[in-house]
């Protein structure tokens, strides 16, 4: 058994790794980051760019608005904007410094149909980006794999920029992941261990990250409610039933996504590599904490509970799949709401199982305006799951994917998302890119 200090350090490390800031949807931002790094390596604006991506990257970049772009969409826009005006040192906030001059130059370059070529790469990890940029007879290559800022290849004219071979760079990145996994292996994550940490643990090392999540994600939610972004899902909900805490919880989460999916330049704290999931983990919990008049310390611990449960569930699915990640985040939010309301550990677990038994398996068909509606639906299911659990009700083991314990249910749903939905993911992409004609 790990000591409390080992457990606390491991979970604080998870929170600090997860809760990084990103400006806009993380997939186009990752493309922009790779392009900015390639341009920086060349030392000038590229003469030509090739961007090769996995299907999931193409799916998630196709329809979402690239932040600070003036309303542009797509991989070409993200890559060229990153190359022209991005600051690679800012990582997932790479486009924060883009100005009107940059946007005008990007429009000029995109008018040349041959300036930036995009291709689909098969047989690679779900999160894969390779940018090849050329200028003045030189070629810079940046490859990102598995995580949005995980650079596994960075070369100039075939010579590794990091001072190691491309294979060594990739091996180094893999070794860091393996070391992190080993560091946390003695502290297995489960609903029980997460609650132990939240109720009794020393959270100080992760407090600043969660405080920033509450501040940033609260700000983009307020922006989404104050102004017309996207399909205005949050404003629609708030206009219909503002006197209902459950509806307000859905509205605040959806509003953050309304703004983020449609080009709002405000940064967010991400969870599981996703700003939408970072928003979904935090906003419903913030609304219920305010409604219940909880003190700030209890709010911080509740948001941590939400984040960690989302990470725990998502770990069974992996980065980017056909399984909508907002479901994982909503499970976390629902569990945190149950905790705020004084629910037992059994009721917290039942909230998660009830939510997965309801909306587990909603498909991801790319980042776009309707993500806000999926977040609303997921949070609605989580609140129903919470209400059922608090009244001693729930779905029985053996019904669908519901198992004897919440951990077994999480594992079964994760298997479906990771393995069972692989073909679903392919068919969704084929329809989106026009490869499959259904009528």
Feature names for model-found ranges:
Residues 2-13, 45-57, 244-263, 295-313, ...:
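Acidic-glycine-rich active-site phosphate/pyrophosphate-binding loop
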Residues 7-17, 25, 89-133, 196, ...:
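Functionally critical mobile loop/hinge segments
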Residues 39, 67, 288-301, 311-377, ...:
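Hydrophobic alpha-helical bundle architecture
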Residues 11-20, 57-66, 259-270, 310-320, ...:
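Glycine/charged-rich beta-loop-alpha catalytic/anionic-binding loops adjacent to active sites
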């Amino acid at each position: 058994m790990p000591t409390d200090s080992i457990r606390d350090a491991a979970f604080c490390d998870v929170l600090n790794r997860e809760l990084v800031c990103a400006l806009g949807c993380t997939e186009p931002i990752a493309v922009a980051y790779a392009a900015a790094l390639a341009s920086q390596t060349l030392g000038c604006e590229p003469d030509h760019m090739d961007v090769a991506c996995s299907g999931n990257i193409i799916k998630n970049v196709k329809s979402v608005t690239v932040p600070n772009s003036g309303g542009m969409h797509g991989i070409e826009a993200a890559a060229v904007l990153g190359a022209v005006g991005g600051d690679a040192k800012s990582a997932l906030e790479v486009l924060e410094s883009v100005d009107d001059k940059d946007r005008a130059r990007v429009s000029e370059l995109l008018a040349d149909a041959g300036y930036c070529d995009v291709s689909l790469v098969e047989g690679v990890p779900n999160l894969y980006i390779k940018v090849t940029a050329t200028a003045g007879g030189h070629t810079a290559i940046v490859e990102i794999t598995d995580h949005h800022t995980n650079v596994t290849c960075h070369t100039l004219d075939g010579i590794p920029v990091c001072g190691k071979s491309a294979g060594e760079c990739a091996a180094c990145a893999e070794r860091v992941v393996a070391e992190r996994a080993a560091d946390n292996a003695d502290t297995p994550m489960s609903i029980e261990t997460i609650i132990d940490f939240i109720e009794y643990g020393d959270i100080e090392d992760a407090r600043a990250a969660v405080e920033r999540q509450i501040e940033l994600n609260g700000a983009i939610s307020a922006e989404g409610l104050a102004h017309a972004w996207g399909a205005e899902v949050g404003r629609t909900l708030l206009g219909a039933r503002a006197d209902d805490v459950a509806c307000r919880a859905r509205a605040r989460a959806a509003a953050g996504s309304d703004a983020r999916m449609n080009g709002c330049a405000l940064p967010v704290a991400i969870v599981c590599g996703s700003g939408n999931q970072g928003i979904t983990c935090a906003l419903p919990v913030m609304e219920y904490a305010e409604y219940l008049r909880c003190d700030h310390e209890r709010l911080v611990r509740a948001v941590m509970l939400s984040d960690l449960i989302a990470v725990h569930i998502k770990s069974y699915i992996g980065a980017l799949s056909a399984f909508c990640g907002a479901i994982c985040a909503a499970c976390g939010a629902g569990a945190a709401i149950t905790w705020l309301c004084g629910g037992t550990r059994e009721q917290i677990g039942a909230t998660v199982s009830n939510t997965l038994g309801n909306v587990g398996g909603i498909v991801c068909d790319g980042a776009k305006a309707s993500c806000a509606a999926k977040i609303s639906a997921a949070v609605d299911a989580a609140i129903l799951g919470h209400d059922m659990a608090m009244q001693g009700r729930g779905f029985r083991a053996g019904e669908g994917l519901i198992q004897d314990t919440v951990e077994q249910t999480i594992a079964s749903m994760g298997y479906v998302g990771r393995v069972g939905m692989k073909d679903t993911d392919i068919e969704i992409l084929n329809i989106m890119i026009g490869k499959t004609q259904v009528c």
